[in-house]
Amino acid sequence: EYLDYTNGDDQVNTAIEGGSAPDLIMEGPERLVANWGAKGVMAPLNDLWTDDAKKDIYESVNSACHNDKGDYYEYPLCMTAHCMAVNMTKVKEVGADKYLDTDKHTWSTEGFLNTVDALYKGGYENVAAIYCGGQGGDQGTRAIINNMYGGTFTDDAHTKYTADSAENIKAIQTLYDTDGINFDASIAGGDEITLFRNGTLQMAFCWNIAQQLNADNNDAGLTNDGDEIMPMAFPTASGDPKLCGGIWGFGVFDNGDEAKVKAAKTFIEFIAADPDQVRDSVLASTYFPVRASVGDIYADNAIMSEYTKFMAYLGDYYQITPGWATARTEWWNMLQRVGTGEDVATSVATFVQNANAAAAAEA
């Protein structure tokens, strides 16, 4: 059964409470490890994580798939990196393409702000939106704010939220003060994508390879009107972007049936670890391999091959921090308050207080 993000959590939680959880599920560490694993309803997969697997699977992925005691509740298959995008046709039109490294897909914070300014002065009143109508696409607003001046969303140990740092406050204030960037409580990430595609916005903070490949209204890599879409890492002052990632893999619910747990593990080994199968499994996902040994599986696909460059920019997978569900809600509420003119330091202090209270309650 395919579950969507509208009510999938409720369906699984209802099944768990009713004693009818599925034997096998494909999801990310924020659910398999930090949620269901922490609640004790998942079977440990430590035996699948052999020394060879640990050497082959990227360390950033490995570290997200186990808890602080070293118990693995996810065996990963594929991953992607979330990024942003710009209307490159319009950027060139206003002479701002000099601020973008289109080979590495990187730019500086100063270059980003100069690009926004050039577009705004070029007649594009709505360059970008800090969307905050809900949690949809919130990885984009977190990433633009964290990257601009080197802030973080959590501490390295994933025990508390750190959005009240001076770096984050500076970034939020800068975005609020910048002409052409508007805090918009009427839209979430999906709405922003629509507005970017139809030309209302000239930048999108909610982007990934699925969006770059989308051909619903025009060819892949083009807006509805045929403008070129350039995917970009988020701007940084350091030149070292840290992108939010998505990791997908398998978890096994412990339903008290050893035979079913064993069968589920056998399935996982075949789909996600068998040298003759794993490449095809990743290709079927349309995402990217978590194993170095799989190599460049998209060499014959120009868009996918180019997007592979973003994998090198993957940052910390902090979504496994306790209190995550509360933190996500508090985040867009905080952005809404900033958008109505509340002092930034006050807004983020409220966010951190509420998010860390939830983290402490779940720790």
Name the predicted role of every residue range.
Residues 1-57, 71, 92-99, 195, ...:
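Extracytoplasmic "Venus flytrap"/periplasmic binding protein-like
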Residues 28-31, 80, 189, 205-212, ...:
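Beta->alpha turn/N-cap motifs
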Residues 28-83, 226-235, 297-302:
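Hinge/lid segment of periplasmic solute-binding proteins
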Residues 70, 173, 178-180, 219-286:
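Extracytoplasmic/periplasmic substrate-recognition and gating elements
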Residues 276-278, 288-290, 295, 309-363:
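Conserved C-terminal helix/tail region of periplasmic/extracytoplasmic solute-binding proteins
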Residues 113-120, 157-187:
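Glycine-centered hinge/linker elements that transmit conformational signals in sensory
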Residues 46-58, 98-105, 128-131, 151-170, ...:
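Short, solvent-exposed loop/beta-turn-alpha elements that line the ligand-binding surface or hinge
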Residues 68-77, 82, 108-160, 201:
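Extracytoplasmic/periplasmic solute-binding protein
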